[in-house]
Swiss-Prot record:
A family per Pfam: ATP-synt_DE_N
CC terms in the record's Gene Ontology section: plasma membrane; proton-transporting ATP synthase complex
Key words of the record: ATP synthesis, Cell inner membrane, Cell membrane, CF(1), Hydrogen ion transport, Ion transport, Membrane, Transport
Function comment: Produces ATP from ADP in the presence of a proton gradient across the membrane.
Cross-referenced HAMAP family: ATP_synth_epsil_bac
Topology of this chain in the membrane: Peripheral membrane protein
Protein name as annotated: ATP synthase epsilon chain
Keyword Coiled coil listed: no
The family this protein is said to belong to: Belongs to the ATPase epsilon chain family.
GO molecular function annotation: ATP binding; proton-transporting ATP synthase activity, rotational mechanism
Principal location class: membrane
Subunit (UniProt): F-type ATPases have 2 components, CF(1) - the catalytic core - and CF(0) - the membrane proton channel. CF(1) has five subunits: alpha(3), beta(3), gamma(1), delta(1), epsilon(1). CF(0) has three main subunits: a, b and c.
Length: 139
């Protein structure tokens, strides 16, 4: 039995996940972070991307986050994000439409806020693609 710890993923609107996991992987500001039971305490910013966690049965699950914070304590890891969406709830058509709109607007002006929005949509699309390739492999 692998060592477990509690993972809590919370958005500004609601708790997205709370349960025991054996590992979690997050896109930190300075690179990818992998956390296992007994990890050194840590507080860091995370960038838009994927939270990937592994349950005790080996099943991997994915959540898109728009950025936020990761707090690692001895028995609990907390991800706080403005926006967090379970991978299976992502809508490819909406993501692609938002991405196209951001690209079109960005091509007409150089705006840091629009560039950040485009980065978030691309990160969201990556999570969607990973989740769907995993689902296709299960069939």
């Amino acid at each position: 039995m692998a060592s477990q710890f509690e993972l809590s993923v919370v958005s500004a609107e609601k708790e997205i996940f709370n349960g025991n996991v054996v590992s979690v992987r997050v896109s930190g500001i300075d690179g990818e972070l992998g956390v296992y039971a007994g990890h050194t305490p840590l507080l860091t910013s995370i960038k838009p991307g994927m939270v990937k966690y592994t349950l005790e049965n080996g099943k991997e699950e994915f959540i898109y986050v728009s950025g936020g914070f990761l707090e690692v304590q001895p028995t609990i890891v907390t991800v706080l994000a403005d926006v967090a969406i379970r991978g299976e709830e992502l809508d490819q058509q909406r993501i692609l439409a938002a991405k196209r709109k951001a690209e079109d607007t960005l091509s007409k002006s150089n705006n840091a806020e629009l560039s950040a929005k485009l980065s978030r949509e691309i990160a969201k699309l990556r999570v969607y693609e990973i989740v769907n390739s995993k689902l296709a492999n299960r069939r």
